[in-house]
Amino acid sequence: MKSKANLFLIGAAKSGTTALAATLGQHPAIAPLPIKEPGHFSTDLRTPVFSSRYNRLLQWDEAAYFKKAPFEERHIGFIESELNYQKLVDQAVATYPEHTYLLDASTAYLYSANAPAQLRHYAADAKIVLLLRNPIDRAYSHYTMALKYGMEQEGPLQAFKREAALHPAHWGQDECY
């Protein structure tokens, strides 16, 4: 029987998922996947529909990444192939043989309409940790990150008004403040 991810850290962007994933990954019973945010179960959020700006920032090529094992640690990628997702799981198992939990920490699952059903189908007994943050603090933190990476040029109030007019905002296309 093949191993499966059985611990999912799902959270709003800029809510502390990276810090919590790093902390959890230090526990001997938790094996983090080589890609912190593989986004595999957010099947409605895929690179072909992302904005060109987001794709440039993402710099993701699934085929190229999986050509050479062991796979490098990476913050984010959108794994479409079930086989490739299993390769991440298998590497985590090999790296952390004493694990109890295999950790997938994808923030995209919070924004995906498909992820809940996909996760339940994949691992109905999985543990899920949901991380949230004060929405105003989270939005401003997200704004400063977008500004840092050149994804935003407007002031915060103008940017928030623009995003608020979108219904709904789309992951990988808009900032989703």
Predicted regions located by residue number:
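PAPS-dependent sulfotransferase catalytic core
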Residues: 1-100, 105-106, 122, 135-166
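Generic, ordered loop/turn and secondary-structure boundary motif
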Residues: 41-42, 110-111, 172
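Acceptor-substrate binding/catalytic loop of class I
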Residues: 75-76, 170-177
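Short, well-ordered alpha-helical scaffold segments within catalytic/effector domains
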Residues: 82, 86, 113-116, 177
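ATP-dependent NMP and nucleoside kinases share a basic, alpha-helical "lid"
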Residues: 111-129
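Short beta-strand/turn micro-motifs composed of small residues
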Residues: 132
